[in-house]
Design a protein with these regions (language model features):
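Residue(s) in the substrate-gating loop at a strand-loop-helix junction
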Residues: 138
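SDR active-site lid
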Residues: 160, 164-224, 234
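The beta1-alpha1 cofactor-binding region of Rossmann-like NAD(H)/NADP(H)-dependent oxidoreductases
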Residues: 56-68, 100
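Conserved glycine-rich Rossmann-like NAD(P)H-binding loop of the short-chain dehydrogenase/reductase
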Residues: 28-44
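Conserved mid-core segment of classical short-chain dehydrogenase/reductases
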Residues: 66, 89-104, 147-150
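Active-site helix of classical SDR
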Residues: 118, 154
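Conserved glycine-rich cofactor-binding loop
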Residues: 12-16
Length: 256
């Protein structure tokens, strides 16, 4: 992926990984547009990094996604990189009957949102030089967190979708999968300071070094995520599943 001179859209750019990526890509000489639901959060990121632009987007609303895509192309016709970063994660007990509002919202944001936005932008991207599509998935797409089963399932689906997009768009749009480990962000309550999670700055440092490799790897997988990424292929899936879920429950209990 070209490192500078791009026009980059980052969804979920008002905080966490999205905001941190936006700052780094601006520093490399790209024009970056961050998008998200919360105008105040977007404004705060732009205030810290004046080279950014911001646009509100309700990724869950199909009509809003189509309207956003039309406005985005009209205002930023050079758009050639899209980073699907917006995501939500909810803890749930799938072993008992429960309200599915959180599950449905997770699917809408994490899976349907990227599908709709890519559909709205794909014809434009195919016409751009050095076009790239980046999906932010998760280590949990390869070994699920049982207490976040729907989140894990959406990330597994996004991995599969990324593989399909890469094959379908070969020669026209570079498709890259970014696979975070557990990172200190506001994704879940207490996560931003949870011991044992990867500090955000360290994660972004490693990610940007991988993006800079030529050719850019098809999968941006930092060292911490690789044991989960390869667990099934290496015959370690069952033991990794148990260890991951035991550690996650202990970490959440310690933070309460």
């Amino acid at each position: 992926m070209q490192q500078s001179g791009n026009t980059v859209l980052i969804t979920g750019g008002g905080s966490g990984i999205g905001a941190a990526l936006a700052a780094r890509f601006v520093d490399l000489g790209n024009h970056v547009i961050i998008a998200g639901r919360r105008q105040a959060a977007l404004d705060a990121v732009v205030a810290d990094h004046p080279g950014l632009s911001a646009m509100t987007l309700d990724i869950d609303d199909p009509a809003a996604v189509n309207d956003f895509a039309a406005r985005l192309i009209a205002e930023h016709p050079g758009l050639n990189v899209v980073i699907h970063n917006a995501g939500v994660m909810r803890i749930e007990d799938v072993a008992t009957r429960h309200d599915l509002a959180d599950a449905e919202a997770t699917i809408a944001t994490n899976l349907l949102g990227p599908i709709r936005l890519t559909n709205a932008l794909v014809d434009h991207l195919k016409q751009q030089p050095n076009a790239a599509l980046v999906t932010v998935t998760s280590r949990l797409g390869f070994v699920p967190l049982v207490d976040a089963a729907v989140y894990s399932a959406t990330k597994a689906a996004m991995h599969s979708l990324t593989v399909s997009w890469r094959a379908a768009l070969a020669g026209a749009v570079e498709v890259i999968e970014l696979i975070p480990p557990a990172v200190q962000t506001g994704l879940t309550p207490g996560q931003a300071t949870r011991p044992g999670y990867m500090p955000l700055t360290d994660f972004i440092d490693e990610v940007m070094a991988l993006f800079a490799e030529q050719p850019t790897p098809r999968e941006i997988a930092v060292a911490r995520v690789r044991p989960l990424r390869t667990a099934e292929a290496d015959g370690r899936f069952d033991v990794t599943l148990t260890a991951l879920n035991d550690m996650a429950r202990a970490a959440r209990a310690a933070s309460h």
